[in-house]
Every structure is written in C-alpha cells, then in structure tokens.
Amino acid sequence: MAPPQERDYIGLSPAAAAALATELRLGLPGTAEEAESEGGGGGGTDAAPLTLELLPKGGAKRGFADAIVGGPAGQRREAAGGKAAAAAAEAEEEEEKKKAQAPAAKAQVVGWPPIRSYRKNTMAMSQPALKGKDDGEAKQAPASGCLYVKVSMDGAPYLRKVDLKMYKNYKELSLALEKMFSCFTVGHGESNGKSGRDGLSDCRLMDLKNGTELVLTYEDKDEDWMLVGDVPWRMFTDSCRRLRIMKGSDAVGLAPRATDKSKNRN
C-alpha cells in the first residue's frame, strides 16, 4: 500500500510560495513586492490590502500639488499673467494719450495724381477768400438782379410775369400791364390838381368790354392781399409776391378807396 502524499493546504512549502508569487492580483505594479517587504518577507501571509493610489509618488505628485495649491509653478504663471496685464494697460494708456494729443484732421483734397503738401496748403488758404467773394456777390445779386412776379386777371385765361425792377413807379407798371392784357386799357382820371403817389392816382384801369373799373392788388410777404399804391414804390417792390387785377366790386373789404371812387363816378 502506497504511503499517503503530503498536501500543503496552508501554503508553507516553497512550491506554494512560488505559485503565490505568480498569482494574478488587482493593483498597480510593485504594490505586492512592497507589501511583502514591509511584512518582513513572511511568505506572503500578511498581504497588504489592495488599494489604488490617486496620486503617484515622487516629483510628479509634487508638481501637481504645486499647480493646485500655488507652489512655484503656479507662482510663475501668476507672475507672467500679471506682467501681461500691466503691459496691456500701459499700451491702452499710451493710445489714449495719443488720441487726446492728436491734432484735428484737415479737409483732405481728393484727386489723382496725389497733390503735394504745399499745394494742399495753398488750396486751403485760397478757399476762405473765395467764400468771401461768393458771399459778397450773393449779397449784391438781389439789388442788381431781376424780381419776377406773376400777374393774373379776373376772366383772363392766362397768367403773365413782370419784372418789377424794370419800372420806377406805379404808372410805368400800369402801362406795362396794358400791353400784356388787351382786354383793359389805362385812362386818366380826375385828380383835382393833386399828384398821386408815384403817379398811380393819375391813371385808372378800365374794362372796355364791360365798362367796369378794375383794381390792381398784390399779395405781400404775409400772404395778405393789399391795394397797389398805398405804400411807396420801393416798399411795394420789396414786399410784393403776386399781382392780381380784380373788379372794383369784388374788392369791397380790400380796397375801400377804389370802391368809393367807383360809386362817386356812377
């Protein structure tokens, strides 16, 4: 009968120790050896608990901690950021100073080929003189220019225009209107030896077809209709905007002097 074989159930034999060394375990490389060395190499009986370290040991752990806590690496980054912010602030201040001290931009002369600087200065100096001449001519233009106004007549199918600057008094204006409108004429009325203002009372407008007296009126700057001849000629030319030849009966509230004359003649 064969002798019984010995079995190492506890794991004290060298073969069991070798099998334990090659056994697969959970953990980082080298953790089992460190646990055995700390336990005194007691054949793996006092195995260290399996743990996963969050941070590696050595210099990597120190650098990571410095970056989080604010060690040397973090201080260098903060110092670099502070210098960049200071440089940007100085650049902004310099730009603001330049803008504040920059002279007012002059009017650019547009053209091609480009105009040199001395030519630009000459043109800039000559512009105020030209403006002064233009203003003087504009002020003198109304005195020497024309003053055209529209002329309408009750019953006439057309309008005319006259230049008031061409006449010196009301009589010349009445003669000009006679030539323009063939349906009325200019006659001499009774003046009782008194000369009228600018010669207006020495003549009267008559409608030859209907035998009625006509009244010459004008519209002033205030858009009010007035009787021609009540103001001096120069004042009339300055304020006249429109002329209208109407019947004396239609100018009851407008020209009482003309209506009174027509009643006395009748």
From Swiss-Prot:
Stored SUPFAM superfamilies: CAD & PB1 domains
Coiled coil: none
Induction per the UniProt record: By auxin.
GO CC, alphabetical: nucleus
Keywords, sorted A to Z: Auxin signaling pathway, Nucleus, Repressor, Transcription, Transcription regulation
Subunit relationships: Homodimers and heterodimers.
Family the entry assigns: Belongs to the Aux/IAA family.
Name of the protein: Auxin-responsive protein IAA21
